[in-house]
């Protein structure tokens, strides 16, 4: 039997770079919120202990894909602790809607959905803390998708505090370019000393993203989309880009702006949600 699992997008409602560690990683403060929009992971169990990704990504080797890595990591961790039923395996496919290099967390969300879904389907019984710890070894954004609640993040993104920001409507636009995260973080002009503030203070301030100035400078497509959106609503970059978003109080307002968008602007309307669609599906 094939089961389907949501793999939602996220937005960084704000993102501030507060420093850089000796190992090169940047410390930050950011606010994660999920969208009721994303990819769908399809899983069909098999009994021969094998993992097969049926929808490979061009240019990514099977064993290097985050989906496969997540499945194998869960398999090894559960087996090492005697919690993996004999023969546990899976065929996995993905209905992809989220762009790569878009700042919407697609790859991290896919990995988290696989961890949560296979832990349930294989009946391994690992806790959310264990799954989040495993997820962190796959990527800094994976734990927030595993835990499934909007969160204020610090450190390199792994220190999470659940929060409940307003669930607004968003017009999310993709400029048609992919931005590798290192391109932004290695830019010498990236702000790296934004003062650390409490979540209470940050929630009262106007939200912004320290990476936005670099993305707009280096990618004219990002600058063009943001310039257009800012004529209609508060708008900013998510993550390190390339996607940008405008926020609205109602769905109709967001859709009215999307209907006026020029032909070169590709976007969708989605609602911000504080409980991940993945976790809603498991209730």
Swiss-Prot record:
Write out the catalysed reaction. Answer: 4-CDP-2-C-methyl-D-erythritol + ATP = 4-CDP-2-C-methyl-D-erythritol 2-phosphate + ADP + H(+)
Q: For binding ATP, which residues are annotated in this chain's numbering? A: 99-109
Q: Which domain of life is it from?
A: Bacteria
- SUPFAM superfamilies found in the cross-reference section: GHMP Kinase, C-terminal domain, Ribosomal protein S5 domain 2-like
Which Pfam families did the record assign? GHMP_kinases_C, GHMP_kinases_N
Which GO BP terms, alphabetically? isopentenyl diphosphate biosynthetic process, methylerythritol 4-phosphate pathway; terpenoid biosynthetic process
Which InterPro entries does the annotation name?
A: GHMP_kinase_C_dom, GHMP_kinase_C_sf, GHMP_kinase_N_dom, IspE, Ribosomal_Su5_D2-typ_SF, Ribsml_uS5_D2-typ_fold_subgr
**What residues make up the catalytic site?**
10, 141
E.C. number, please? 2.7.1.148
Pathway field of the UniProt record reads: Isoprenoid biosynthesis; isopentenyl diphosphate biosynthesis via DXP pathway; isopentenyl diphosphate from 1-deoxy-D-xylulose 5-phosphate: step 3/6
Alphabetical keyword list: ATP-binding, Isoprene biosynthesis, Kinase, Nucleotide-binding, Transferase
GO terms, molecular function = 4-(cytidine 5'-diphospho)-2-C-methyl-D-erythritol kinase activity; ATP binding
EC class of this enzyme? transferase
Q: How does it assemble?
A: Homodimer.
State the protein's purpose: Catalyzes the phosphorylation of the position 2 hydroxy group of 4-diphosphocytidyl-2C-methyl-D-erythritol.
Family the UniProt entry places it in: Belongs to the GHMP kinase family. IspE subfamily.
Q: What NCBIfam families does its record include?
A: ispE
Name of the protein in question: 4-diphosphocytidyl-2-C-methyl-D-erythritol kinase
Record gene name: ispE
């Amino acid at each position: 039997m094939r089961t389907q699992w949501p793999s939602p997008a996220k937005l960084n409602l704000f993102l501030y770079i507060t420093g850089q560690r000796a190992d090169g990683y940047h410390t930050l403060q950011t606010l994660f919120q999920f969208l009721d929009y994303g990819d769908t992971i399809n899983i069909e169990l098999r009994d021969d202990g094998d993992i097969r990704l049926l929808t490979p990504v061009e240019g990514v080797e099977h064993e290097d894909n985050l989906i496969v890595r997540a499945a194998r990591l869960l398999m090894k961790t559960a087996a090492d602790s005697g919690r993996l039923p004999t023969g546990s395996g899976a065929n996995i496919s993905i209905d992809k809607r989220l762009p790569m290099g878009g700042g919407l967390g697609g790859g991290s969300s896919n990995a988290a959905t696989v961890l949560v879904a296979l832990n349930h389907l294989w009946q391994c019984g690992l806790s959310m803390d264990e799954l989040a710890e495993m997820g962190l070894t796959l990527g800094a954004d994976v734990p927030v998708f595993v835990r499934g609640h909007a969160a204020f993040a610090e450190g390199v993104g792994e220190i999470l505090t659940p929060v409940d920001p307003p669930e607004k409507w968003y017009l999310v636009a993709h400029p048609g370019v992919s931005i590798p995260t290192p391109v932004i973080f290695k830019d010498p002009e990236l702000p790296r000393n934004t003062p650390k503030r409490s979540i209470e203070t940050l929630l009262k301030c106007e939200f912004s993203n320290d990476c936005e100035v670099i993305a707009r400078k280096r990618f004219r497509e990002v600058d063009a989309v943001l310039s257009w959106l800012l004529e209609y609503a508060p708008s900013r970059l998510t993550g390190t880009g390339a996607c940008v978003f405008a926020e609205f109080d109602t769905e109709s307002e967001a859709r009215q702006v999307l209907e006026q968008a020029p032909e070169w602007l590709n976007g969708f309307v989605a609602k911000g949600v504080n409980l991940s669609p993945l976790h809603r599906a498991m209730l």
